[in-house]
Design a protein with these regions (language model features):
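Polyanion-binding interface signature
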Residues: 1-112
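Charge-biased C-terminal accessory regions appended to nucleic-acid-, cytoskeletal NTPase
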Residues: 83-147
Length: 147
């Protein structure tokens, strides 16, 4: 089995080297768990709005792992944020292959991917870049809630 931590390190390096990755973007990488967020998304303690993926023992056993978007307890007006955000982006998310809109608790959307080490790094980058397209709507909804 390939070293998942190494794959996540490479994903982090490649995200940081991307044209779009600027000072306001942040990555929290805990080995086999990674979050991507912007500094204004209330994610300083990993409990705000973020894109997330992880491959830990249960995912290895299941041979599948999630790529998801969360708005956790540090997100201002969490339930309203999720409702307003999904009003803007639900159709787009549903159009993406394999994505489920959840909108319950802190989960906004998720895609479960098969754990195939052959293209794992590329798949992770592809999905995080897809979720990153939601950036402007996250910013817009957060700005409307904290005026």
């Amino acid at each position: 089995m390939k070293d998942i931590k190494n794959i996540f390190r490479n994903v982090e390096k490649r995200l940081r080297a991307s044209r779009w990755f600027e000072d306001e973007w942040e990555i929290y990488n805990r080995g086999t768990y990674l979050q991507l967020a912007k500094s204004n998304w209330y994610n300083g303690s990993q409990g705000g709005v973020h894109f997330e993926t992880y491959i830990e023992a249960p995912q290895v056993k299941k041979k599948a792992f999630p790529v998801c978007m969360h708005a956790e307890e540090d997100c201002p007006s969490q339930a309203k944020f999720i409702d307003d955000f999904l009003q803007l982006e639900q159709a787009r998310i549903r159009s993406w292959k394999g994505y489920q809109v959840i909108g319950d608790g802190y989960s906004i959307c998720q895609r479960e991917l098969p754990l195939n080490f052959k293209n794992l790094e590329e798949r992770l980058l592809e999905e995080l870049n897809r979720l990153r397209q939601l950036e402007s709507s996250v910013d817009k909804v957060l700005q409307s809630l904290v005026r």
